Regions:
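Short, conserved micro-motifs composed of acidic
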Residues: 1-166, 170-180, 185, 190-194
Length: 197
C-alpha cells in the first residue's frame, strides 16, 4: 500500500478532470497540486500530471479549486506571501498554468487561509446595482473567529472611479468644449468621451 496521501480533491463539473494535492515522489516539495483526467465518467482517473513550478514550490501547496475552467485557486506556504498558508491564483493559458499571484488583503492575512471557493449565484451590489465581481468563501484561523479554522464570506465589488478635469488650449489657455479624451486602463481597456463645459 502507498504511504503517500492524496488530499483536497476538486472535481470539474464535467467530472472528467480532478485536481488534488499529494506528497507522492517526484514533486517540487512537500505537497504539490496535481491533476488527473479520464475519457468518460465511468472510467478511472489516470494521466496524473504535476502542475509545475508556477504553481508548486519546495513548500506545501494544498486545497486546489478551479473557477471558469481557467483560474486555479490554492493555498501555499512556499510562494512569497503574508505568512502561513496564503491563497494564490494561477491562470491557465495555452494549457500552461501561469506564475501564481497572491490574493493579498483582505483575503490573506499573516495567519492561514485555505479552501477558496466561489459562489456563482448572480446578484447585484445594492449600492451600485452592478453585478458583483466575485463572492465566495474561504477558511482561516485568523484572530477574531470562534475557534480553529472559521469560514469567512467575501464580496469583491466592482471598482468605480470618478474622474474630473479640464482641457485647455496650450496657447490661449481657454477651455476646449468637445475635445475628445481617452482614458486607458492598465489592463488595456479604454473609454472615450468628450469634454462638456
Amino acid at each position: 500500500p502507498d504511504s503517500f496521501n492524496y488530499v483536497h480533491p476538486f472535481i470539474m463539473e464535467d467530472e472528467l478532470t480532478i485536481y488534488f494535492a499529494s506528497n507522492i515522489p517526484g514533486g517540487y516539495g512537500g505537497y504539490d497540486i496535481y491533476k488527473a483526467t479520464r475519457a468518460k465518467k465511468s472510467a478511472k482517473f489516470s494521466n496524473i500530471t504535476n502542475l509545475g513550478p508556477n504553481v508548486n514550490t519546495p513548500g506545501q501547496e494544498v486545497f486546489p479549486a478551479m473557477r471558469d475552467d481557467s483560474l486555479l485557486y490554492f493555498s501555499s506556504d512556499g510562494h512569497v506571501g503574508m505568512g502561513g498558508l496564503d491563497i494564490f491564483v494561477s491562470v491557465l493559458k495555452n494549457n500552461q498554468f501561469q506564475q501564481a499571484e497572491n490574493m493579498m488583503v483582505p483575503i490573506n492575512s499573516c495567519w492561514d487561509e485555505i479552501g477558496m471557493i466561489y459562489d456563482e449565484t448572480p446578484s447585484l451590489d445594492p449600492k451600485s446595482k452592478s453585478p458583483y465581481l466575485a463572492k465566495g468563501f474561504f477558511s482561516s484561523n485568523r484572530p477574531g473567529g470562534r475557534g480553529g479554522d472559521d469560514i469567512y464570506y467575501f464580496v469583491l465589488r466592482p471598482l468605480v472611479y470618478s474622474i474630473a478635469g479640464f482641457v485647455k488650449d496650450a496657447a490661449t489657455l481657454q477651455y476646449i468644449d468637445g475635445a475628445e479624451v481617452e482614458i486607458i486602463g492598465s489592463d488595456g481597456s479604454s473609454y472615450k468621451t468628450l469634454t462638456d463645459i
